[in-house]
């Protein structure tokens, strides 16, 4: 089974810095959550995800940092850990590979 069989283009995503999530479990501190969505799947298994926006401004997620991704599919929620591999602009939308 492929990821694209479970998660679809357009599915919403909550993104949080994994290290902050792990710290919050110990300290009960609230972790910043960024909203995004799935844009495309690549043949190499990577995923294109829109860079999140906050207060009308683009949030540039750091390269190489591990993020917790919670996918809201039609059937269920799915959690994964991923990294930004590349940031680029395509059709006036900033994307990342995960």
Region roles according to the model:
Residues 1-98:
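Structured alpha-helical
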């Amino acid at each position: 089974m492929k990821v694209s069989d479970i998660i679809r283009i357009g599915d919403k995503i909550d993104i949080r810095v994994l290290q902050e999530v792990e710290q919050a479990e110990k300290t009960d501190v609230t972790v910043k959550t960024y909203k995004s969505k799935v844009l495309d799947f690549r043949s190499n298994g990577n995923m294109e995800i829109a860079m999140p926006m906050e207060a009308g401004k683009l949030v540039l997620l750091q390269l190489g940092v591990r993020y917790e991704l919670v996918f809201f599919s039609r059937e269920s929620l799915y959690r994964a850990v991923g990294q930004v591999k590349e940031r680029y602009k395509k059709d006036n939308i900033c994307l990342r590979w995960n």
